[in-house]
Amino acid sequence: MSKLKAQSALQKLIESQKNPNANEDGYFRRKRLAKKERPFEPKKLVQQQQRLKEKKKNENIIYLKKTMRVTPSEEKIHEMINQKRETKKRKRKQKKKNDDDYGVFEEDMLEL
């Protein structure tokens, strides 16, 4: 920065500190005015809120996937339970067939 620019910047700073309302060329003052003149944009706010919700939802899903993962021992237990259910169903079917073989379910053979 040249000497002249540095001196003028220093003087502007001193003047703005003495009377902040007098100098309308101030950088921060322009920033404040620009902020006030900006129109209200609800679309952006809604989009930001949606992004935050989606982000939280994704984080929750990732966390649940990590914590709720089925361990190998749990998988074996589930397989054993399913096998027991299948064998029970198979036995019921076999029993029904056996009973049918003797004519229990045929109405012609039933004697009341």
UniProtKB/Swiss-Prot annotation:
Biased composition (Polar residues): 8-22
Record keywords, A-Z: Nucleus
Biased composition (Basic residues): 86-96
Protein name per UniProt: Uncharacterized protein C144.01
Keyword Heme: no
GO cellular component assignments: nucleolus
Biological source species: Schizosaccharomyces pombe (strain 972 / ATCC 24843)
Region (Disordered): 1-53, 80-112
Subcellular location: Nucleus, Nucleolus
UniProt feature, compositional bias: Acidic residues: 101-112
